[in-house]
Amino acid sequence: MELFKFEPLLKQTIWGGSKIVTFKHLQSDLDNVGESWEISGVPGDESVVANGEWKGKTLNEVLAEMKDKLVGADNYQRFGNRFPLLIKFIDARQDLSIQVHPDDEIAHKQGKPMGKTEMWYVMDSDEGASLKVGLKKKITPEEYARMVDDDTICDALGNYQVKSGDCFFIPAGRIHAICSGSFIAEIQQTSDVTYRIYDYKRKDKDGNFRQLHTKEAAEAIDYTVLDDYRTDYTPVKNEATLLVSCPLFTTAVYDLTEPMTLDYSELDSFVILIAVKGEGSILTSSGDTYTFREGESVLLPATTDIVKVEGNIKFLETFV
């Protein structure tokens, strides 16, 4: 059995910082790197395999040949040749825009192929860093439009001081924003549909205001108010700790100080492992050993049965 590693796919943004290049141990002088697309099947931004017999092939080319052997029978029937998840690292040197993503139904009505549900795992944060998630008070669509116009929409949003290990589930329709000083891993549907609600009246490098999608967002927003949007969980060493389980993905975190065997023989899905701290190795049932250290994301095909992870390493595990 072979696991897949991928070439870096870095995105420079007006709000990006310098953490990603260091975190991924890259030799690069790029600045303002806001995102690393770790595993992507988004057309035009497809990950390229960096190892083994598939080296140089895109993820979508591998999927077209391997089909259900890569993603699992149910997933292949459900998603076809569209890889279902997009994995990112995000480094916010400045605040990102206030935004929302549509669900699949609304996305289809607005001419988009798929909506977007996602989750955030905070890998690191500067002192005072925060995330904006969800509505903290009830507002109507009319009040929403007024608050965007008079620059008070942030007053309606939950604001969370964050630290390493914090987790937030962001289903389609939930308003959110990543704020300066946050360094996160993002797991999401394979979609790049974002409706920008508010951007602090900032201008791009050409002196233009960035496009807003206030009207489209109004239709997509879920106006439900929750008491707390932070995921409540208690991490346990050397065990799987569930973070999120929804129809689109299931994610757990592992914090290992001793070897652990992961049995996927009954799972009809690919598995992605995302190293967020430390280093170790992955041993497959066929006897192959792969290095695995922070900043790396690896894809295990659905044919994987058992792997052993060794080392002092914290990583996320996600599958569909």
Model-assigned labels for residue ranges:
Residues K138-D150, D268-E279:
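Short, basic/aromatic beta-hairpin or loop at an interaction surface
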Residues I87-K88, L96, E118-Y121, N159-Y160, ...:
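His/acidic/aromatic-lined binding-pocket segments of jelly-roll/cupin-type domains
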Residues Y195-L267:
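C-terminal amphipathic alpha-helical segment
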Residues T261-L262, G278-L283, S297:
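Short beta-strand segments in beta-sandwich/barrel cores
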Residues M1-I139, D199-D227, T251:
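Transition-metal
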Residues L157-F169, T284-T304:
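Short acidic-glycine-tyrosine-enriched beta hairpin
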Residues M147-Y195:
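Loop-centered beta-sheet repeat module
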Residues G80-R82, I90-D95, D104, S125-G128, ...:
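Ligand-binding loop in jelly-roll beta-barrel domains
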